[in-house]
Amino acid sequence: MLIIPAVDIKDGKCVQLVQGKPGTEQVVLDDPAGVAGRWESLGAETIHVVDLDGALGLEKNTGILKEITERVSVPLQIGGGIRSREYAGKLLDMGFERVILGTMAIENPAIVEELAGEYGSERIMVSLDSRDSRVVIRGWTEKVPFTAEEMARKFQERGAGSILFTNVDFEGLLSGFDLKPVSELVEAVEIPVIYSGGVSSLNDLRMLQGTGVMGVVIGSAIYRGLIDLTEALKYQDLK
């Protein structure tokens, strides 16, 4: 199980927000590329990058994203504001290993098939954010009438190589999470599932390991000192 530290970027800085809401910054650090490099130096094998400005439709972190790809050698996955096939391709060509498609994929599933055909399924991840057992889009503001399992099966057929599952009810709250929807999603598809949302302790990682997820994204907990990344990374070696 991969332990994947998150680097969320807003206004050129590395931040951590509560449930993704602007103005709720819990952590603000300069030099996002340096932060990513530190996580790599501690042993992270993949790093999760989110362009929070991009998620709001602002393409102003291109230079920082490029710097991260130049300073970090482990695989990078990037999400936030990917609203076109062209921009997804730009990020892949920039050096990101995987692009994470959210609202765009749900509103236009064919884009997943097109990008998978051009770049390979392994480089296309679809993000499914769930609230009250339904997938939400557009920055978690709009609910669609499908469960994460239903959507995941659909995108598997379209050629997605993996799924990022976020339980919005717990994201950024450091309050734990519900294992049941995670296990159900893993069982619903054959492609790998990565989980994000509410992880706040090493015990959480131990429990998630039993669900069969390929990896876990950790954000607030490592920035606020609740989880030591070095200790968390030991779970990568456990079977």
UniProtKB/Swiss-Prot annotation:
Question: One GO term of the cellular component aspect?
Answer: cytoplasm
User: According to the UniProt entry, what is the EC number of this protein?
Assistant: 5.3.1.16
Q: Which GO terms describe its molecular function?
A: 1-(5-phosphoribosyl)-5-[(5-phosphoribosylamino)methylideneamino]imidazole-4-carboxamide isomerase activity
Gene3D superfamilies linked to this entry? Aldolase class I
Query: According to its UniProt record, where is this protein located?
Result: Cytoplasm
Enzyme class name = isomerase
Protein name per the record: 1-(5-phosphoribosyl)-5-[(5-phosphoribosylamino)methylideneamino] imidazole-4-carboxamide isomerase
Q: Which organism is it from?
A: Methanothermobacter thermautotrophicus (strain ATCC 29096 / DSM 1053 / JCM 10044 / NBRC 100330 / Delta H)
The gene coding this protein:
hisA
